[in-house]
Amino acid sequence: MTVKMGYMLQKEERRMGGGNVSQDQTSIICIDLKSFYASVECVERGLNPFKTNLVVADPTRSKSTICLAITPAMKALGIKNRCRIHEIPDCVKYITAMPRMQLYMDYSAKIYGIYLRYVSKEDIHVYSVDECFIDVTNYLQLYHLTAKEMAVKLMQAVMEETGITATAGVGTNLYLAKIAMDIVAKHVDDHIGILDEFSYREQLWDHKPLSDFWRIGSRTEKKLAGYGIHTMGDIAMASLRSEDWLYKMFGIDAELLIDHAWGYETCRMSDIKNYHSEEHSLSNGQVLMRNYSFDEALVIVREMTDNLVLDLFEKGLVTSSLTLWIAYDHRYEHEASKGTVKLERGSNSSKKIMDAVENLYLRIADRYTGIRRIEVCANRVAPESYVQYSLFDDPKQTDKERHLQEAVLNVKQRYGKNAIMRGSNLLECSTYRERNEQIGGHRA
């Protein structure tokens, strides 16, 4: 069946009365915890986030530090959520809250527990620390509620037990629930957006900008604009004329773009729960607070590799491929350096991995341009039991290194991550001690 024919059939169904989100349709709720980090900080202080100017940021880093969150009260003043500290007008007085990532994770876990009182974990997909999707299709009849009433029930429970305000989107698929929350909920008094395929086309086919829509970035928006396409309706109509040029431009991603233009989403909650990636990886990355020289950045690469190896060892995993990514000060307009090195066989040996990453760094890094971002990634990770050791491996040396790694891990688990350090971790350029006290690159 063509897209056009499918659209015409659904249009006829709606004419016969099938256009609303009803009990016999899939019903997805997408819930977002409003200005989550900032709201948590307000709750902890007994303040109202809708009446309090509060910023979650670490001003000790620099005045260019990006705010992790601001309260709705500050958004109402026209201040952007992900602004930098120096971009906040001097006339605006506000409270600065240092990030407390562990606290936010604790709140998020508590809220997840609230959801579990109403639905099974198999019907919840945690999208981020402050956002989740819930398939309530099989619960509406049980609770004698509509999908919107179910959303209200969950939002009220979160508010009553944590003090955190939420917004929600209700849709007939994952995509529509997300869009209902991201776009529609902002313009309704109860902060609950509702969409099905038909109301989506009626309400949002002319919506601008395209970058407001999930998974459409500024580059895609700009590329489409070059062809006179500025709305989802434009994409849908273009797909009716000819899909080929969209596939030539975006490859396989064109299928998702076209589906979303029509309000379709083939991925279901069960697909997410049953998905298992064929390849797994572990990574460690950080943004540096100033330009690092070639030698200083090598210290950081070693520290990150140390932590990555220990993570592999602790989880009983090995890697057979390592990738290093280096980005430079944007003022130099220097393209990022990236390289990958393969190991002879899967390993979590500190020496083998460190040697491989160091050599890769020496090969790809620019020695004369300030370095600002680094990421080390262990690719193709697999359980250690799958590894076949070579006849050329030295069993005594291997055992010695494993015993050392095990001892280091035990000490760190018992006394803290900074209990054992290399001498280089005490250098002024080192970020090792500070990073070990963070969660996700921010203060715990």
Placement of each model-derived feature along the sequence:
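Residues that scaffold, gate, or flank divalent-cation-dependent active/transport sites
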Residues: T2-V129, F133, D259-A261
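Catalytic palm subdomain of template-directed nucleic-acid polymerases
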Residues: I134-M155, G228
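Short Gly/Ser/Thr- and Asp/Glu-enriched loop/turn motifs at secondary-structure junctions
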Residues: Y127-E131, G171-L174, L317-S321, T369-R373
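Short acidic, glycine/serine/threonine-rich loops at helix termini
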Residues: V40-C42, I66-A69, L176-V184, Y247, ...
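Acidic, metal-coordinating catalytic segment for phosphate/diphosphate chemistry
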Residues: M5, V40, K338-G339, L343-A444
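Long, highly charged, low-complexity intrinsically disordered interaction regions
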Residues: M150-K208
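DNA-contacting surface of Y-family translesion DNA polymerases
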Residues: C30, D212, K222-Y368
